From Swiss-Prot:
Record-linked Gene3D superfamilies: Leucine Dehydrogenase, chain A, domain 1, NAD(P)-binding Rossmann-like Domain
Catalytic activity as recorded in UniProt: (6R)-5,10-methylene-5,6,7,8-tetrahydrofolate + NADP(+) = (6R)-5,10-methenyltetrahydrofolate + NADPH; (6R)-5,10-methenyltetrahydrofolate + H2O = (6R)-10-formyltetrahydrofolate + H(+)
Gene: folD
Phylogenetic lineage: Bacteria, Pseudomonadati, Pseudomonadota, Gammaproteobacteria, Enterobacterales
Name of the featured protein: Bifunctional protein FolD
Family label: Belongs to the tetrahydrofolate dehydrogenase/cyclohydrolase family.
UniProt GO molecular function: methenyltetrahydrofolate cyclohydrolase activity; methylenetetrahydrofolate dehydrogenase (NADP+) activity
Species, as recorded: Buchnera aphidicola subsp. Baizongia pistaciae (strain Bp)
GO cellular component assignments: cytosol
InterPro entries in the cross-refs: Aminoacid_DH-like_N_sf, NAD(P)-bd_dom_sf, THF_DH/CycHdrlase, THF_DH/CycHdrlase_cat_dom, THF_DH/CycHdrlase_CS, THF_DH/CycHdrlase_NAD-bd_dom
Pathway assigned in UniProt: One-carbon metabolism; tetrahydrofolate interconversion
Assembly behavior: Homodimer.
Length: 287
């Protein structure tokens, strides 16, 4: 079976051009550009880099991005007040609170305070519930970015046994819902799962998101499996690697995502696509 490295950067570039074309058309009609509000709490270096990347991408496709940065000791009520104002700001179509959020702030409370139609990260209970009910609106960016990538490469996953390693609210749980929606038989594993190798060895498709460098070895993977690596880990030497031991997993897999350049770009482009979708819905509602 032909081995392929799934190039998220290349797909994202194509989708970026498509979004820019749509935005330019809207502007030619005299409409305002889409607007994304980004809130950063604390000074996490990785978060700062991610925010810069997202804002840069906004500019590339003609979006307006507005940015608020707060110290990690900010009162939760002040963030909630800002979100309340942004919910009713007619120039803002999407609201993003960059993760991770300091432990003194209830992240679920923040996600729930964003109105569902501006929840471009897809974490509001309404949007998660809609995904579970098989009628998704704004979908969590990383899981849907992965589905978009698989579709782009025309990889058929209906009927496959998919194993998700990691059960976070951000990736693992919504990923399992996306895979169910796509027709997979889905197993979700977590830190309490006994005999993890047993489940992984049965998988036709593996999605791993646990934040543990080189955790998944090629010896665990059955020949021909599809391997999707969501992990981003920095080694002591500064190298960025995923949760998968790429060299050994590559030998066994049929398709595999690299880190960097795999899932990451798909997450960002899905955020932009969600923002455009929210913008178009708001524009339609205003007519």
């Amino acid at each position: 079976m032909l081995k392929k490295v799934l190039n998220g950067t290349r797909i994202a570039k194509k989708l970026e051009f498509k979004i820019l074309k749509q935005v330019n058309y809207k502007l030619s009609l005299g409409q305002r550009p889409p607007g994304l509000a980004v809130i950063l709490i604390g000074s996490n270096s990785a978060s700062t880099i991610y925010v810069k990347k997202k804002r840069f991408m906004c500019e590339q496709v003609g979006f307006i991005s507005k940015f608020w940065k707060f110290s990690k000791n900010i009162q939760e009520s002040k963030i909630l007040n800002l979100i309340y104002k942004l919910n009713y700001d007619t120039t803002i179509d999407g609201i993003l609170v960059q993760l991770p959020i300091p432990p003194n702030i209830n992240n679920q409370k923040l996600f729930s305070s964003i109105i569902p139609t501006k929840d471009v990260d897809g974490f509001h209970p309404y949007n998660i519930g809609s995904l579970c009910q098989k009628s998704p609106y704004l979908r969590p960016c990383t899981p849907f970015g992965i589905i978009t990538m698989l579709k782009h490469y025309k990889i058929k996953i209906r009927g496959l046994h998919a194993v998700v390693i990691g059960a976070s609210n951000i990736v693992g749980r919504p990923m399992s819902m996306e895979l169910l929606l796509a027709g997979c038989t889905t197993t979700i594993t977590h830190r309490f799962t006994k005999n993890l190798k047993h489940y992984v060895k049965q998988a036709d498709l593996i999605v791993i998101a646990i934040g543990h460098a080189h955790f998944l070895k090629g010896t665990w993977i059955k020949k021909g499996a599809i391997v999707i690596d969501v992990g981003i880990n920095r080694l002591k030497n500064g190298e960025i690697v995923g949760d998968v031991d790429f060299k050994t997993a590559y030998k066994k897999s049929s398709y595999i995502t690299p880190v960097p350049g795999g899932v990451g770009p798909m997450t960002v482009i899905t955020l932009l696509n969600n923002t455009l979708k929210a913008y178009e819905q708001i524009s339609k509602d205003c007519k």
